[in-house]
A protein has these predicted regions:
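ABC ATPase nucleotide-binding domains
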Residues: 1-61
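Hydrophobic beta-strand signal
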Residues: 40, 97-99, 153
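Generic structural signal for well-ordered beta-strand positions
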Residues: 48, 116, 171-172
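ATPase nucleotide-binding modules
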Residues: 54, 58-116, 121, 125-146
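Detector for glycine-centered tight turns/loop "hinges" at secondary-structure junctions
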Residues: 86-88, 166-169
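Short, Lys/Arg- and Gly-enriched loop/turn segments at beta-strand edges
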Residues: 159-167
Length: 172
């Protein structure tokens, strides 16, 4: 296990020292994100996105990229009309999917939600919350006092919202 953790660092140092281009294939997203200058994300043999790790995480080109990169994955909420499916919460713009990273969602906001389950991870707490017909995952501090069944308010800045069309492509 320790060798598996040290190998990406060793390979990166070797690549920089030799100055050669290295193509490294992995199914481990964390490994790819931590080692790469550029990531080519494939889905069934098709390139979903080719970008720096930071761009891949911050500006996913598709819902596949959004849901594949990150732990927990980006929230992808269905939009019906101009609202999050089954709710009165405005989606912010015309789209089919609204996405936001779990760490971009904050507690104590305008969006009513019900905590359906929690995962206590020590420093972090992952809360799964029902918003209308959708489930929204929130990553917050492990000190947060939440319990399944509790009613909470959620919020996110418009700048962290990602919008995707019906085919899963990012809208500009």
């Amino acid at each position: 296990a320790q060798l598996r953790q040290e190998m990406p660092t060793e390979l990166g140092q070797l690549q920089r020292r030799l100055g050669h281009t290295v193509v490294y294939v992995t199914h481990d997203q964390a490994e790819a994100m931590s080692m790469a200058d550029q990531v080519v994300l494939l889905n069934r043999g098709r390139i979903e996105q080719a970008a720096t790790p930071r761009t891949l995480y911050a500006q996913p080109a598709t819902t596949f990229a959004a849901s594949f990169i990150g732990t927990p994955a980006m929230n992808l909420l269905r939009i019906e009309g101009d609202r999050i499916a089954g709710s009165d919460v405005p989606a912010g713009r015309a789209a089919h999917w609204l996405g936001m990273r779990p760490e971009a969602v904050t507690l104590g906001g305008r969006v009513p939600a019900t905590v359906t389950s929690i995962e206590y991870l020590g420093a972090d707490l992952i809360a799964h919350c029902a918003v209308g017909k959708e489930t929204l995952t929130v990553r917050t501090t492990g000190q947060a006092d939440l319990a399944a069944g509790s009613e909470v308010g959620l919020d996110w800045a418009p700048s962290v919202a990602h919008h995707f069309d019906a085919e899963g492509r990012r809208l500009a």
